[in-house]
Structure formats: C-alpha cells, structure tokens
C-alpha cells in the first residue's frame, strides 16, 4: 500500500465531534473532488473519489449534517485506469446542500474558492479543510530530494484558499501551475510531518519519518540519523504512555477535571504520538510546549492523589510492556 493510501485510510477514521468541523471537511471534499450539474432540471452533486472508506465517510457526514440521502457507487476499472473509483452522488436536497457547504452563494452563484465559513473559521476548521482536500485529491511521495505533499485543485481560487488555511495552522505551502493544473504543495520535510499531524495522520507520519531517516542514514554525511530514529521511537513511546495515563486520569477524576487541564489531556489522547511542541501548536489558542507539559503533569498528579485516596490503581497502572511494544 502506498503512503497516500495509508494516509487516506487513517484520515477516513479520524473522529470529528463538532458539526462545524465536519461541515468544513465536507465542504473541502466537495470542492476538490466534486462536480455540480443539472439533470432533468434538478441539481446533482457528485464527488469522484479513489477510496471507498472516504466515500462512506462523506456519505455519513452529509446524511448526519443535512438529513439527506446520499448514494455511493463503485465505478469499475477500465483499460486505462486499473483501479476502481467511487462516486458519491447527492440528489436529495442538493440545492440546499450546495448552499450550506459553500459551493454556491445564497443567490446561487458558484463559489470558486473555499466556503467563507471555512476560510474565516477556527483552527480546527482549517485542519478539516486540509483533511478534506487531501482525501479528495491529495498525494504524498516517498521521502527524498523531490518529496512533497500535494493537492490537485479545481482552480487557482481554491488553491489560494488552501494555502491560506495552511498559513493559519503554521504550515508554509505554495501554489504552482503544472501541466495546466493548479496544485498546492508542501516540500519541507518538517512542514510535511507537521501537516500530517494536523490533519490527523500521525501513524503515517511516523512511517514517513522512519523512511526519511533510513534514507538519510545511507549516506556517510547522515550516519547520525540512526540516533534520530532511536530518539524518535523513544519520544513516541513516552507520548503513547502519557496518553494512556491521561485516559486513566480522566476516568479517575470524572467530572472533576478542570476545563483547562481537560483540554490539554484531550489533545494528548487525540494525538498520541505527537510531540509536546506539536500539541502546543494544535491547541486553540496555541500554547508553548512547557504550558502543555505543565497542564498534563498537574492532571496526572491530581488523578494519582485521588487514586491513592480511593485506594484504586493510579495512572501508571495502565503503562504496560504490551502497550509500548506496539510502537
């Protein structure tokens, strides 16, 4: 399986609780993979995707948000195309969905960029826009001199809007016109890694980073990359252990968790292998890594004290060898 397939499989399983964030992802998928056409005097919206999982996710989100029927059809391979495609078709209430997702304005004019609600939305909305755009038409090449994370765009306006979303989450992305198509790409290795985490593909990021480090270690000038690989695994294990402890802490404390500590804890649980610095960037508003570490430390201390009082297993009880061997 390619890195691109790995990412899409992982992103298709990202849990999204807020409806506004779900709507931002839907809007981006429909913008970057969708097409509107009139059939028999009625508007039909279709999204052409390369993953059944993505198609099912889009179907679930649209039906949940807009209470409209959505069909997913498999388009069999052809002589020129050896893999199947998946067509998500929206007929029921398509006019209303087009307006609510920002594909058209209230007066019915086509929006060429991203929906205003996404462009001016929250950090989570910007992350969802990138997740949706990548699920629709994104790719990631193997690490190397020309490695890049790229999204094929329907036009210059949508490309510029995606660059703007990247800027809002601290990622440097650029537009380019290649073979008559507008594209947005990220070439810096650190930026690619950070963007994968932002979108929710932390496991694939670890795989990509491991491939990058192994490639670099093949050259004499980069022999120390092996140490980086070991450090990366140690950091990942520590992060996973912390996430498990935080989950246990939340169970111990229940509703007594202070809101600011709960927010830091949720970040740790949702992004299990991210560094403290990355968690700080994921926070809204953003925090320093020391602030994140301090809040998580206070949460664990508070839970361990409660566990001691109640004479129940503390947060360290969940950190087992089996847990760490998975990394």
Curated annotation (Swiss-Prot):
**Record Pfam families:** HTH_WhiA, LAGLIDADG_WhiA, WhiA_N
Q: Does the keyword Protein biosynthesis apply?
A: no
InterPro entries with a match to the protein in the record: Homing_endonucl, Sporu_reg_WhiA_N_dom, Sporulation_regulator_WhiA, Sporulation_regulator_WhiA_C, WhiA_LAGLIDADG_dom
Is DNA-binding one of the keywords?
A: yes
Q: Which residues bind DNA?
A: 275-308
The alphabetized UniProt keywords are: Cell cycle, Cell division, DNA-binding
Single GO biological process annotation from the record: regulation of sporulation
Q: A Gene Ontology molecular-function term?
A: DNA binding
**The family this protein is said to belong to:** Belongs to the WhiA family.
What is the role of this chain? Involved in cell division and chromosome segregation.
Q: What is this protein called?
A: Probable cell division protein WhiA
User: What species was this sequence derived from?
Assistant: Corynebacterium glutamicum (strain ATCC 13032 / DSM 20300 / JCM 1318 / BCRC 11384 / CCUG 27702 / LMG 3730 / NBRC 12168 / NCIMB 10025 / NRRL B-2784 / 534)
Q: Which gene encodes it?
A: whiA
């Amino acid at each position: 399986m390619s890195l691109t397939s790995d990412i899409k499989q992982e992103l298709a399983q990202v849990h999204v609780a807020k409806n506004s964030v779900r709507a931002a992802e839907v809007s981006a998928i429909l913008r970057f993979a969708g097409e509107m056409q009139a059939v028999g005097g009625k508007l039909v919206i279709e999204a052409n995707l390369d993953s059944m999982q993505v198609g099912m996710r889009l179907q679930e989100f649209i039906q949940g948000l807009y209470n409209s029927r959505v069909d997913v059809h498999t388009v069999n391979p052809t002589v020129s195309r050896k893999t199947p495609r998946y067509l998500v078709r929206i007929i029921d209430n398509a006019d209303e969905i087009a307006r609510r997702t920002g594909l058209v304005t209230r007066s019915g004019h086509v929006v060429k960029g991203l929906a205003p609600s996404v462009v001016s939305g929250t950090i989570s909305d910007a992350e969802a826009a990138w997740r949706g755009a990548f699920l629709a038409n994104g790719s990631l090449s193997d690490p190397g001199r020309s490695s890049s994370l790229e999204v094929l765009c329907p036009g210059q306006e949508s490309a510029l809007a995606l660059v703007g979303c990247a800027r809002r989450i601290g990622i440097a992305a650029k537009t380019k016109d290649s073979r008559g198509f507008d594209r947005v790409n990220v070439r810096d290795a650190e930026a690619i890694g950070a963007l994968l985490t932002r979108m929710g593909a932390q496991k694939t990021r670890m795989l990509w980073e491991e491939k990058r480090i192994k490639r670099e270690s093949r050259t004499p000038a980069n022999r120390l990359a092996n140490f980086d690989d070991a450090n990366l695994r140690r950091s990942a294990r520590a992060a996973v252990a912390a996430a498990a402890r935080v989950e246990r802490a939340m169970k111990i404390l229940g509703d007594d968790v202070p809101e600011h500590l709960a927010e830091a804890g949720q970040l740790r649980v949702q992004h299990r292998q991210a560094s403290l610095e990355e968690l700080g960037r994921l926070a809204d508003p953003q925090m320093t890594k020391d602030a994140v570490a301090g809040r998580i430390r206070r949460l664990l201390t508070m839970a361990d004290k409660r566990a001691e009082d109640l004479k129940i297993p503390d947060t360290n009880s969940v950190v087992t060898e089996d847990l760490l061997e998975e990394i």
